[in-house]
Amino acid sequence: MGIFDFFKSSEKKEKEKEKETAGSGNNNAAKNAQIRRQIYDIANNESEMMENGNYSDDFTEVSYYDDFGKEFKMPKKDWLEKKLYPSIRKNWNNMDGLYPIIQDAFSKGVYTEVKEAVLRFYAADENFERKMILLGTYHTKTGAYQNALELYEKNLNIDNITEGLCIAYAEVLELCGKVPEAERKYYDALEINPNSATAFKKYFDIVKRRNVKEYESKLEKLSEISGNWRAKMMRAMVFFKKGDKESGNFFLINALKESGYNSEVMYITSSIYILNELYDEFKQYVLAYYNPEKHNAYTALNVLKYYKVRNLYKEGLELCKFTSKFPWIEHYKKFMYYEDYFWKMKVNSESLNNDERASNHFFSTDKPIWYYEFNHPEFMLNQSRRIKPNVLILTFTSIGEKSELAENLAVSLPLYLNENLHYKTNLNYQLAVAYNKESLFVSKKRYSIDYMKLIRQQNNNLNFVLAGNILKMPNVEKYEIEIYLYDTFNEQKSTLVNKIYDENNIYSVQNDLLKAVSTFFERDFSIKYERNLHNLILFSPKLKFLIQSKIHKEHQSWRYKKLLSDQIDIVLEDRNNDLKKINLLALLYEIKQTNSQLLKFQKPIIYSMNIHGIFETQTLKILAPIIFKIYDDDVNFQANIEALNITDSNYLSWINRFSEE
């Protein structure tokens, strides 16, 4: 029984359509109806928009995020009508709900369209500081500086002033050209909180523009007050810029102590020590108090720099692995660099994998690569009998200018073809990918006729060799890609793809390849056209993990982290593609074996995807229970297995393998 027959025989599970809950009570129905009418008037009054010069602005694109945090874009007018206004109406009587909606609109440069919501919020919110700053911000962003000024002048007094209100008031004063008054208000904010980042910067920016000596004098006075760690930190930076490391270090140490070794001061101190090569001080005053749970990614990277200088590869690898559990994906390249660096140190120091004469090997398959790390689910394979012609698929060559993308495509394109040929055809083929030690091997030279003849001599029944060349053109993001079939009997070459792609259309090479193969072999299989490279370029790193040792995988945390993040994005942008979802589940299980620390951060989105039915297709619903096994959620795992009520022995045997570990 093949995957298709098995899925057809599974019981269909009816989906319950979620019903939208009704809004809050009808106590203020008449009032709310009038308010909604005002919002509709704002949305639909096109003549008013045209008079204000905002009509064409409706067709600019606005970014928004769905329930999974996936970014989408739509015309501003559509966003207003479909997203913003419905959200405002829903939260009209809920100030804690209305506040982030208005803030989000402000972040998108949307102001006049939320005027009624701002006024409503100001009238109803019980948080004085919050509503004052919101209305003041609205006036400021719409150019009504005088209105903002009057708002603060009339409502602020010694009894209700706060740090935030002082700063907001001062910012308006600056915009109105009243710099001396703004300076005093920023100072008032510092008297409330001497370590306020915004007030400190804006106050001293004004002072420094006026006179550098005055800046240093006032900084000195503030730094002498106990508890003013920000002033001490800034004064330390002044000393270091002047080359006075001793005085600078004195103030850094005190800033660290007074701040409780907080994240900001630890980052600044560690950066200064690394920049000035003060490694003993780094060890004594940073490393001794460093806590990756408390301190930020920048401090972690500085600690890794220190480990690199001191050749502490064990500590470096340990920190890379530990920090991979944090949501610092934007720093993945830097952490990957250190992982690779420390791994190479480990290999060299411990004489691991040091056979310099190791020859190339071949990973040979006609199965999708996720199969191997997913407990070999035979029932998920296409069990159709394979028939001639017999085809060998080779890794493509990467020639011309050195290119990371070209080398990736040289491996990823054959792997992508492999996955499609396996499920969509009965073609008898075999993919062979060369590797050396734990690295994929991509030839820098075209395959010769003699090489093709040698392959034929070793495979008497072989009909075709499918190969290709990816040439990165010099000094431009263009790629000349040739993919061909070599007829081993007639010793003739048939071109499948021969085209120059640029960075905007190179994604289409995968579509062109499938079309050409389908036409040549007269298989006429369905093609799911891709619109980007996101999915394609993940094949190469997945295979690289497959050929690596377990101990190496354990120290590839950041590569796994990036791969998992990308795979989730791929599923969310193509939610009807079951193969991409299977790849995600297989990757989650693979990660559990060597880097389980990565799973916790992604658990909410994985569970949410399951709740929203992304894994509820005929194919995926029998795999979804594995999610709960991966997260050690035995209650939900057993409940899902019982609900499926599948008695097929192949499936049950596979499921049991996850419990045997």
Question: Model segments located where?
Answer:
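Catalytic-center loop of serine/cysteine hydrolases
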Residues: 440-546
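Short beta-strand->alpha-helix linker/helix-N-cap micro-motif
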Residues: 386-459, 463-475, 494
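TPR-adjacent "capping" and linker segments in tetratricopeptide-repeat scaffold/adaptor proteins
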Residues: 80-97, 121-125, 220-225, 381-386, ...
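Register position in tetratricopeptide repeats
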Residues: 107, 141-142, 175-176, 208-210, ...
